[in-house]
Amino acid sequence: MPDAKDVILKHIAAVNDRDSDADPWAADAEIVAPGGRASGRDDVIGFLSVFHEAFPDLRLEIKQLLSDGPGAAAEGTLTGTHDGVLHTPNGDVAPTGRAVVLRWAAVYVTDGDTLKSEHLFFDQMDFLGQLGLLPG
């Protein structure tokens, strides 16, 4: 049985390569993140594609990855340039051209070689500030 770390590393590589076919999400996967959630493989991939559209050069880097059985936790950075439209629950944000470096953490549950769930955490205020969307 694959180690949870291997599944997470495959997921991160698929995100960085923009290869949704290689992303190991399970058919009944779930993602929960600031500002939204999605259930089911297709909806999860659609949820993540919002970030690819907004940040065409998006890259995820893991700084630390821990696992125990089917569970894993990671911390890392997201880098990218806001050169595309960012679709949010409150409306679309036009490209700002700003580069962001966003710290994130996630808790994962795997099942064999698939990713069942991700609970993603990041500082929304930091994110909005880097995009120049806060008064100030």
Predicted regions and their residues:
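C-terminal and inter-domain tail/linker signature
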Residues: M1-G136
